[in-house]
Design a protein with these regions (language model features):
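Solvent-exposed, well-ordered amphipathic alpha-helical segments
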Residues: 7-10, 14-21, 46, 50, ...
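C-terminal/domain-edge helix-coil "capping" segments
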Residues: 1-6, 52-57, 101-104, 110-159
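Mid-chain, structured segments of secreted extracytoplasmic proteins
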Residues: 35-64, 69
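A structural "domain/chain start" motif
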Residues: 1-43, 47, 146-159
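Second-shell loop/turn segments in exported
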Residues: 32-40, 79, 120-131
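Residue-identity detector for threonine
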Residues: 15, 24, 32, 37, ...
Length: 159
């Protein structure tokens, strides 16, 4: 999980989001089967996302804005020297004080490639690629959230 946590600089967010976001649920992930392949499970992604949102000053137990996360697809190679993984994750941010109006509904695709130089064992390269793709997806979400402008009467993404 710790390898999926966003550890970059603090971003700027709309003041309405500051310490005002809750994470309702994370679904769609799969548990790793030690006899088969590495996967991204709901708990690991949820933990990394919570840690990332907390570090950015966004997460709150009683936040007005609620984030639901659905892991739509995780594209993984079966074998190879370079392991490229792409996560497709849907994020739905709703305003619970406004009849659960949808503030943002985005599906983000993010890729990460782990090479032979990162790890000799294919199983470890796949795990690193999964974690890297998860982290890239969380980073892209934070970028979307930092572009979000919330006005009580109007909600939009800055261009």
């Amino acid at each position: 999980m710790e390898n999926m946590v966003y550890d970059g600089p603090l971003k700027q967010y709309d003041t309405h989001l500051a310490d005002n976001m809750g994470l309702t649920k994370v679904s769609g992930g799969e548990e790793t089967n030690p006899a088969w392949t590495s996967e991204i499970d709901d708990d690991a992604f949820s933990g990394a996302l919570k840690e990332s949102l907390t570090a950015q000053g966004l997460l709150s137990d009683n936040g007005r804005y609620q984030l639901e996360v659905v892991m739509v697809e995780v594209d993984q190679p079966m074998f190879g020297l370079d392991m490229a993984v792409t996560t497709h994750i849907k994020y739905i941010l709703s305003d619970r004080e406004n009849g659960n109006a949808v503030v943002m509904d985005e599906t983000i695709a993010a890729q990460y490639t782990a090479t032979l130089g990162d790890a000799f064992a294919a199983v470890k390269r796949l795990r690193l690629a999964n974690e890297g793709s998860g982290k890239a997806n969380i980073t892209a979400l934070l970028d979307k959230l930092s572009a979000l402008q919330i006005d009580p009467g109007e909600i939009s993404l800055t261009q």
